Amino acid sequence: MRFAHLSDIHLGFQKHEALQKIEQDVFERAVDECISRRVDFILIPGDLFHVNIPEMRVQKFAFAKFRQIYDAGIPVYVVYGSHDFSPVSNSVIDLLAVVGYIMKVTLATSLDDGRIKLDFVVDKKTGVKIAGLSGLKVGKDRVYYEKLDRESLEAESGLKIFLFHGGISEMKTESGMDGENMPLSML
């Protein structure tokens, strides 16, 4: 099995034209590499875009690249990050999902006891089971992890991947970004 993990891409972040070109070139090279290496799937755990609805030029570029991935038969599994999150599914990510270019793996159900149960998306080629939680700004997603029904996730057999967007306290370096991180025990 071979997969790519592309996180914090932040398409649309750059405002200066020369930097926009670099931003797009880097993403284009990553996509081309995924296609040429024939990865089984691509994981994007948040912040594909810098905002939930980027400029039209960014949307056009993204749709063209994801069309290439789709045409190559490579599924893309995504969760929102803290920058491209939309509580009402009002994001370019949702448009990409509606046309079938990507799949959001944030399938959650609220249980009677208040816990959150995640359902898995099964990759057709590999059988890998993927579930995830989107990232929210300033660590507000912590409450979801506190309510997460871990028992059902752990009871699921087979190879599983949990897709999330956020920092882990134990992995933070001295030169790392400041912000809200979660302890590894919450995952």
Residue ranges and their predicted role:
Residues 41, 54-67, 72, 77-187:
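His/Asp/Glu-rich metal-coordinating catalytic cores
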